[in-house]
Curated annotation (Swiss-Prot):
Keyword Ribosomal protein: yes
Gene label: rpsH
One Pfam family recorded for the sequence: Ribosomal_S8
Cross-referenced InterPro entries: Ribosomal_uS8, Ribosomal_uS8_CS, Ribosomal_uS8_sf
GO MF terms, alphabetically ordered: rRNA binding; structural constituent of ribosome
UniProt GO BP: translation
Oligomeric and partner information: Part of the 30S ribosomal subunit. Contacts proteins S5 and S12.
A single cellular component GO annotation: ribonucleoprotein complex
Coiled coil: none
Family the UniProt entry places it in: Belongs to the universal ribosomal protein uS8 family.
Name assigned to this protein: Small ribosomal subunit protein uS8
Keywords annotated in UniProt: Ribonucleoprotein, Ribosomal protein, RNA-binding, rRNA-binding
Classification lineage: Bacteria, Pseudomonadati, Pseudomonadota, Gammaproteobacteria, Oceanospirillales
Organism of origin: Chromohalobacter salexigens (strain ATCC BAA-138 / DSM 3043 / CIP 106854 / NCIMB 13768 / 1H11)
Length: 130
């Protein structure tokens, strides 16, 4: 059986690992997952990530906790394979009144909603994180 929504699987694995207070979580790797992990690290939501090469590349994400609680309180898929959500630069969502981020895939790469607004581009809103 093939996996239909690999990003939703990534977010579910992160949520489940944080509920179990795991230090790291591994999952099958893809270019898009690696870019999402890069944005999460850049914004301080995870400690680090590594990609192991091979026949089946794996992405290992090192989770981040603050005083025993997960830094990522909420991570949710926004645009789904069954219902894609594209937004212009002015319509990009503000997550938790600007305290969270929306991860957007644009023509200039994967970036946060703030970076997309600064670059003046819109795109597909992948997920929201706070």
């Amino acid at each position: 059986m093939s996996m239909q929504d690999t990003l939703a699987d990534m977010f579910t694995r992160i949520r489940n690992a944080q509920m179990a207070t795991k230090e790291t979580v591994t999952m099958p790797s893809s270019n898009l997952k690696t870019e999402v992990a890069r944005v999460l690290k850049q914004e301080g939501y995870i400690n680090d990530f590594t990609v192991t090469e091979g026949a089946k590349p794996q992405l290992a994400v090192t989770l981040k906790y603050f005083e025993g609680k997960p830094v990522i309180e909420h991570i949710q898929r926004f645009s789904k394979p069954s219902l894609r959500s594209y937004k212009g630069k002015d319509a990009l969502p503000k997550v938790a009144d600007g305290l969270g981020i929306a991860i957007v895939t644009t023509s200039q790469g994967v970036m946060t909603d703030r970076a997309a607004r600064q670059a003046g581009v819109g795109g597909e809103v992948i997920c929201t994180v706070f």
